[in-house]
Amino acid sequence: MSTQGLVQLISNAQCHLRTSTNYNDVHTQFNAVLNYKNKGTNTIDGSEAWCSSIVDTNQYIVAGCEVPRTFMCVALQGRGDHDQWVTSYKIRYSLDNVTWSEYRNGAAITGVTDRNTVVNHFFDTPIRARSIAIHPLTWNNHISLRCEFYTQPVQSSVTQVGADIYTGDNCALNTGSGKREVVVPVKFQFEFATLPKVALNFDQIDCTDATNQTRIGVQPRNITTKGFDCVFYTWNANKVYSLRADYIATALE
């Protein structure tokens, strides 16, 4: 399995981190980023890992998000500047930050065996949560780790609305018979990042028919991220003087 296409939650500052304890103020969650290096030039950058001050199975590091995320994988790494790493751990998570669940009923997950090798664990099924925590169970010399959580990208709904798409007066639908159409190009106010869905509704209808049956339609055609063609149409003996429509375009980005 691959992390390609997934979001690195911690590295991209998409969450808040909190720890149970810190060895001191240069062994904190700040140092827990995967592949973190202190550059070896001074002590200000601190340890190449988060290190707990208490060494027992009650320690943890938790990532909390503003909105629910879909967690796919957790990555673990040891301390880069000492022979300290977590050899097994469990995962706990919560969707509402009130009720917590244990992944695999709290079963141990294999950790790492050296300072710098990154070990990924892909969850059996995606975990939907606001907060997720690593709880070390066993360790080499000290509880020290660097880590990352991989999630699905968060998509949000982006909507644009437009009005007054007009065929013009006495348009081409007002003459002839059979299937006829008028195409009006529409440009969005700004370009979507992904292809939107477009819905149209009539705002004004001006037409007649000797049989008292009004046959008209409107639909989008040739939709792109920049715009679409608004197609007004009629058929049979309908005479359409003019039509006007509004649109709603929505995309997940």
Curated annotation (Swiss-Prot):
Residue positions, PTM N-acetylserine: S2
The protein's name in its UniProt record: Discoidin-1 subunit B/C
Annotated source species: Dictyostelium discoideum
Key words of the record: Acetylation, Cell adhesion, Cytoplasm, Lectin
GO cellular component, one term: protein complex involved in cell adhesion
Organ and tissue specificity: Stalk cells.
Any coiled-coil regions, as ranges: none
Annotated InterPro entries: FA58C (IPR000421), Galactose-bd-like_sf (IPR008979), Galactose-binding_lectin (IPR052487), H-type_lectin_dom_sf (IPR037221), H-type_lectin_domain (IPR019019)
Gene Ontology BP terms: cell adhesion; cell-cell adhesion; cytoskeleton organization; response to cAMP; response to folic acid
Domain of life where this protein originates: Eukaryota
Compartment(s) of residence: Cytoplasm
CDD domains noted in UniProt: FA58C
